[in-house]
Amino acid sequence: MKTIAHLSDLHFGRHDETAAERLLGDLSELRPDLVVITGDLTQRARHSQFAVARAFLEKLPRPVIVVPGNHDVPLYDVIQRFVGRLARYRRYICAELQPFFADDEIALLGLNTARSATFSNGRISYAQAAAIKSVFADVPAGRLRILAIHHPLAVPVPGGDLLPVGRAAMARRAMIEAGVGLVLSGHFHRAFSGDLPGSDLVADGLILFVHAGTAISTRLRGEPNSYNLLRVGPESVTCTVRAFFGTHFGDADSVHYALVGGRWAQQQ
């Protein structure tokens, strides 16, 4: 079993300093095997915000896998937005926009969905869908295949103002073909884990979707700052939401999932 700390939507530049300090302390104590950050490290992609984000990342337990979010693309600098949209991210955070991590139990691929002209809601490219299949094709059997992206592939409650990433159906088909079992994302600032069925999904329950809330941002959406602590194995995932209670992070909710007949099912 591996322990993964899944953080998202830090939004340095509009963040809670106390929450940031307590988060570092919590992770230092828990010592996860892997830290995954699914985008929006900054509020407005400014040099100063990226510098603070970089200093924060350097204090995290290693290894760390990071993907960008739409807030990591400059909003008001129009030239930079379209000519060098992720130049600052690549300078301060990570030059690799398709990071990959693998050990003897898991394989994790990160993709940049803050691309094209659709920064806000994101989009998966045809090349990225192909990469999902080609990268995981080389992963030995018996390892949990994980995809990390900023924009979710589906919304927990359809019909509201939240939208899935562009070309989500194409991406989900590629993931099913590649044997991806777990998807980590953020963007909505709301914690969620479970199945997100849809008419364009080949079969329900094949993929477990986990959304992280905002770890330290003051841009809250009806729930406290939080991150996910995952205990994962080839056929099981326990997702624990670690919420910020003003002075410390602690367990707020925990759900266990297991593969039953090739499909994820919540266990009592």
Describe the residue ranges of each PLM region:
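N-terminal active-site segment of His-dependent metallophosphoesterases
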Residues: 1-59, 75-79, 96-97, 131
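Conserved beta-sheet core of the metallophosphoesterase superfamily
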Residues: 160-238
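Charged helix-capping and loop-helix junction motifs
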Residues: 21, 49-53, 125-130, 161-170
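Short acidic, glycine-rich surface-loop motifs adjacent to enzyme active sites
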Residues: 141-156
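Extended active-site neighborhood of metal-dependent phosphoesterases/phosphodiesterases
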Residues: 51-134, 139-141, 174, 202-203, ...
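A short C-terminal boundary segment appended to hydrolase-like catalytic domains
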Residues: 231-268
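Active-site environment of divalent metal-dependent phosphoester hydrolases
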Residues: 13-15, 43-48, 70-78, 116-120, ...
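Active-site neighborhood of phospho(di)ester-bond hydrolases with catalytic His/Asp-centered motifs
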Residues: 7-8, 35-40, 64-70, 112, ...
